[in-house]
């Protein structure tokens, strides 16, 4: 028999060749060869040991991947090689075997191989089935690692070793205590356990009351300024009065006691004359001479100066409060009627004010007794001084809103006119050439 057919464990037929024929088939990888190597110890001779060694070598080379349907062919290949090694043409010096023994040995080996395939078939299936869950577990492990790498809160964790805590060197612990903004939430405190702040209601109420008082004072000062506008030289007078007040306070401390006696008398007199001045202001029709004449105001200011102030303050008040007759007339005649009220100074209400209120440290507030209605001042000024209406018209005309219109020069048009001697046709031709 040249060819032997034998049936595998799954019903597929494999073809085996006799001794002396070489096979050029390369063994394909297989996963479960340990059963095959365990079933071959029944063979005898050194040639069989050489076959066992080659089977183990092929087992080491064929551990990657393979199909179970090609395993009987691999077994047949190993058997053929074994037969080829024990062929009658090849004789070892130690032992010579006749050809009849080799034929019987091949039959025995085929039977043994078939039995080993029957035994090792279920084991190989079990190995293959056990390999599948291991591969699936490996895939799941790789997927979980990829998901873990992609589920990091932010790339800020991988900036360097400074970001990681030495107390928690593991990344999982670090992620447990850190969020995406790298805030340490482990040391956070609940709001209920936080220390209570002090009661700020008293502070807020006091600040609101102070704000209301200040707002009222500002409103009163604005209303007083709206009723009686401040004079243009009010800042100069305020500075002079402040300096005078400081000098008066210094003179009280160092001055002789005779000044105190002289101060008490005019205060009593001022208290007596105070109601008369208040009745005049409340009536709304005061005398024109008492309000507007600079001579009466000068006399009153000199009386207050001699009674209340020491000697060194006389030149200061002469420069600041008393206006000469010529300068006052020039100012009043050169200004319109609306500006006349600013230059009138009435010092009559000063008499009913105490010495401390006469020279206050702060000159931003206006006393209500000093407020004079503007209508009465305008009536008195219209009776005493005649305003110059032409100057008012000049001021209106010199406003920046009105501008003179520019006139076009008729001579400019004559420059472009053609000459009288040359006709129009010739001019058109010359223009076309140029």
From Swiss-Prot:
Ranges of biased composition (kind: Basic and acidic residues): 46-62
Region span, Disordered: 1-102, 249-289, 404-424
Metal-binding found in the keyword field: no
Motif annotated as POLO box domain (PBD)-binding, chain positions: 334-336
GO CC, one annotated term: kinetochore
UniProt note: phenotype after gene disruption: Infertility due to defects in meiosis. Mice develop normally and show no visible phenotype but are completely infertile (both males and females) due to defects in meiotic chromosome segregation during meiosis I. Monooriented kinetochores split prematurely and sister chromosomes separate entirely before anaphase of meiosis II.
Compartments (UniProt record): Chromosome, Centromere; Chromosome, Centromere, Kinetochore
Keywords of the record: Centromere, Chromosome, Chromosome partition, Kinetochore, Meiosis
Biased composition (Polar residues): 64-76
Tissue spec. comment: Germ cell-specific. Expressed in both testis and ovary. Not expressed in other tissues.
Recorded superkingdom: Eukaryota
Chain residue ranges for the region called Required for localization to kinetochores: 391-394
GO biological-process terms attached to the record: female meiosis chromosome segregation; homologous chromosome segregation; male meiosis chromosome segregation; meiotic sister chromatid cohesion involved in meiosis I; meiotic sister chromatid cohesion, centromeric
Quaternary data: Interacts with CENPC. Interacts with PLK1; required for recruitment of PLK1 at kinetochores.
Role noted for this protein: Key regulator of kinetochore function during meiosis I: required both for mono-orientation of kinetochores on sister chromosomes and protection of centromeric cohesin from separase-mediated cleavage. Acts by facilitating kinetochore mono-orientation during meiosis I, when kinetochores on sister chromosomes face the same direction and are thus captured and pulled by spindle fibers from the same pole. Also required to prevent cleavage of cohesin at centromeres during meiosis I, possibly by acting as a regulator of the shugoshin-dependent protection pathway.
Protein name per the record: Meiosis-specific kinetochore protein
Taxonomic source organism: Mus musculus
Lineage: Eukaryota, Metazoa, Chordata, Craniata, Vertebrata
